């Protein structure tokens, strides 16, 4: 991938995001594959690191439920994930607790910028699953229903953190290619072709 933006312009983009001007970071002068991006972006490395963190937290809670039949950790994690994804969908990953930790971990790594819109779509799915898990676990439902949903979440988190495969972004691209989602100029560049829409560029 080729992406360039003067340091001052990147800082300006982050500052604009902090003021809530846009979802994601607007970075004037950001060039990816010879093309200047206009729409908000996220750092793919931070997104993948955040997926890894949530996977570890979720795996610990799942272990308590599976091996010791203790569901309080799973109940607490489901509620935390509900808040986490609500913040991501509303304000972006830089303001969520896990997103802040991921940004700290990736602070010394060169960013890989990707369009924010498909990620928001994927996190909306995560928000729905977290809401369902919160309702299920707080309703006293135990057994394979919450554990199966947790396994689905862990699988999706592992795919994104380890392989860079965003299933929610894949679904976004699938819907867009069939015309069920209208062309959106905010989708300009995708990590490893994860959203694969005709008007988007692929970033390696």
Segments and roles (model prediction):
Residues 2-204:
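Membrane-interfacial helix-loop segments of redox and metal-homeostasis proteins
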């Amino acid at each position: 991938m080729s992406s360039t933006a003067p340091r001052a312009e990147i800082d300006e983009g982050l500052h604009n995001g902090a003021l809530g001007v846009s979802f994601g970071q607007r970075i004037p002068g950001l060039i990816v594959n010879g093309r200047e991006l206009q729409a908000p972006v996220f750092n793919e490395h931070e997104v993948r690191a955040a997926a890894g963190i949530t996977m570890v937290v979720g795996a610990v809670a799942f272990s308590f439920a599976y091996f010791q039949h203790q569901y309080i950790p799973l109940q607490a994690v489901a509620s935390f994930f509900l808040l986490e994804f609500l913040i991501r969908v509303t304000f972006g990953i830089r303001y969520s607790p896990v997103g802040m930790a991921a940004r700290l971990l990736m602070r010394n790594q060169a960013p890989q910028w990707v369009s924010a819109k498909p990620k928001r779509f994927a996190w909306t799915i995560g928000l729905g699953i977290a809401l369902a898990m919160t309702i299920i676990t707080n309703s006293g439902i135990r057994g394979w229903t919450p554990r199966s949903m947790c396994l689905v979440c862990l699988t999706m988190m592992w795919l994104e953190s380890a392989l860079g495969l965003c299933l929610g972004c894949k679904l976004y691209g699938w819907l867009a290619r069939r015309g069920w989602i209208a062309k959106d100029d905010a989708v300009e560049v995708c990590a490893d072709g994860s959203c694969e829409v005709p008007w988007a560029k692929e970033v390696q």
